[in-house]
Amino acid sequence: MRIIQTTGKRKTAIARAVIREGRGRVRINGKPVEIIEPEIARFTILEPLILAGEEIWNSVDIDVKVQGGGFMGQAEAARIAIARALVEWTGDMNLKEKFIKYDRTMLVGDPRRTEPHKPNRSTKGPRAKRQKSYR
């Protein structure tokens, strides 16, 4: 039995996907993907599977474990891990090209991170300044 493990990162969320032969089940942290809420996060996770097609989707089972970050960061990390797993599973360069043409961050990741807050400005943000008064 063939098993492939891949990872995906987005902001502070890290996802680990395990793909194996199966019947098309997708589980996120042990829950079926069908019950993941909100809906936008669910569709984000399923994007690579929809693009790959039903034939590939129904021939594999995917288990994803995600931790860290918020719900959207986790969804996008899971999406990256699933896309990488599908490309590795099929070994199909056409699928890889399809993913890259649709959305490059599906395989490559997004390097942007939040800017650290600077000293003496408390919770206002990294670039907030006190308003200057001339009188």
Swiss-Prot record:
Alphabetical GO biological process terms: maturation of SSU-rRNA from tricistronic rRNA transcript (SSU-rRNA, 5.8S rRNA, LSU-rRNA); translation
Keyword field: Ribonucleoprotein, Ribosomal protein
Superkingdom as given in the UniProt entry: Archaea
Coiled coil: none
Gene3D superfamilies documented for this protein: 3.30.230.10
Listed Basic residues bias regions: 119-135
A Gene Ontology term for the protein's cellular component: cytosolic small ribosomal subunit
InterPro entries listed in its UniProt record: Ribosomal_Su5_D2-typ_SF, Ribosomal_uS9, Ribosomal_uS9_archaeal, Ribosomal_uS9_CS, Ribsml_uS5_D2-typ_fold_subgr
Region (Disordered): 108-135
Family note: Belongs to the universal ribosomal protein uS9 family.
Name the UniProt record assigns to this protein: Small ribosomal subunit protein uS9
Protein's organism: Pyrococcus horikoshii (strain ATCC 700860 / DSM 12428 / JCM 9974 / NBRC 100139 / OT-3)
